Amino acid sequence: MMKCLFLLCLCLLPIVVFSSTFTSQNLIDLPSESPLPKPVLDTNGKELNPDSSYRIISIGRGALGGDVYLGKSPNSDAPCPDGVFRYNSDVGPSGTPVRFIPLSGGIFEDQLLNIQFNIPTVKLCVSYTIWKVGNLNAYFRTMLLETGGTIGQADSSYFKIVKLSNFGYNLLYCPITPPFLCPFCRDDNFCAKVGVVIQNGKRRLALVNENPLDVLFQEV
């Protein structure tokens, strides 16, 4: 009997020693929480505000520069200007102010939002201030950015702002539902980069596979 008790104690000893190591001073390391989203900053280093207006300006200078503006699309029968363009140079007119409308809260990197030209307009043209991506253009073999979108709807009006590794930001088009036709939509989020194509001598914003538009945001 004494021999059995002795053997039982020997069996329990490692368990007691092992459990004693788990004290309040020696806790198991659990996976850390996801990092907080980073706010998008303007040219002055301030966080973008949904209630403020900004110009989208190119990082490049000269012919590589130019602000984003609202203009009339070639051959369009829309009653209001309905194209999203970039001026051909940073020497010239200022761009059309925009505001960024997040799903909720502030404006953060890699978060869905709507973009709207923030200008006075008649009631007929209100929807023609909201950015969206149009249908596949057969000539350019891509989709052009235009206005006529909606706010807060699961359609072609959602974008993201992503930080470049060194300086500035890119715009991404990110439809809520998988697009039927989107030649440059990639990865699990079906996002596509926004760049420019030349349309009738003007630089039109469009979805691109390479050379996206590198931009900054200047508060108005």
Swiss-Prot record:
It comes from the Eukaryota. Residues 1-23 form the signal peptide. Keywords: Aspartic protease inhibitor, Disulfide bond, Protease inhibitor, Serine protease inhibitor, Signal, Vacuole. The record marks 143-144 as: Reactive bond for chymotrypsin. It is found in: Vacuole. Disulfide bonds join 80-125, 174-185. The record marks 99-100 as: Reactive bond for trypsin. SUPFAM superfamilies: STI-like. Its main location: other. InterPro entries: Kunitz_inhibitor_STI-like_sf, Prot_inh_Kunz-lg. Residues 24-32 form a propeptide. Inhibitor of cathepsin D (aspartic protease) and trypsin (serine protease). May protect the plant by inhibiting proteases of invading organisms. Belongs to the protease inhibitor I3 (leguminous Kunitz-type inhibitor) family. This is Aspartic protease inhibitor 8. The lineage of its organism: Eukaryota, Viridiplantae, Streptophyta, Embryophyta, Tracheophyta.
